[in-house]
Regions:
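A generic structural motif
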Residues: 1-2, 144
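Core dinuclear metal-dependent hydrolase active-site scaffold
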Residues: 2-68, 152-157
């Protein structure tokens, strides 16, 4: 049995060709802690971070999102896209369900440059207009160079 120590790379089975590292991410900790996973293959690395409270709590040393991803050598990132904006949840207190909105994330990211990692938005709430590929919101996100996770996609690391 292998023991997994958070923040240290873990190889699920010897010679499998990749490691997994858990990194703590601020998100409602009432029942347990929350971690993102970095999966490093032989050529590329992927960050899986479907849940977080806010970018201001997640980002360290005042880095912006892209600097933060580069500091961890991330090539592909799956990030929290729960809500497009707060109008989706006007009937609830946003403080009860903290997530950065896609609008906030896009304002921090700007348009994708050639050197930026791939970013895919995941963990979409059923109210999120990104679920409709033909929505204006989906078109805006894609026109900026970012992506929406699609079930069945394959990523080579």
């Amino acid at each position: 049995l292998n023991t997994w120590n958070p923040t240290e790379p873990f190889e699920p089975s010897e010679g499998c060709g990749f490691t997994i590292t858990a990194i703590p991410i601020p998100h409602r900790s009432e029942l347990s802690d929350n971690h993102a996973l970095i999966i490093r293959g032989e050529e590329r690395s992927l960050l899986f971070m479907p849940d977080q409270d806010s970018w201001s709590k997640t980002l360290v040393e005042d880095l912006d999102i892209l600097e933060w991803l580069r500091s961890m050598d991330i090539d592909i990132a799956f990030i929290d896209g729960t809500f497009w904006d707060h109008s989706e949840i006007s009937h609830r207190d946003v403080a009860e369900i903290p997530h950065p909105t896609v609008v906030d994330t896009l304002s921090r990211l700007g348009k994708k440059s050639d050197s930026a990692p791939e970013i895919h938005f995941t963990h979409l709430n059923h109210t999120n207009p990104l679920l409709d590929n033909g929505s204006l919101q989906s078109e805006e996100l894609v026109s900026m160079g970012w992506e929406i996770c699609k079930q069945g996609s394959i990523f080579y690391l």
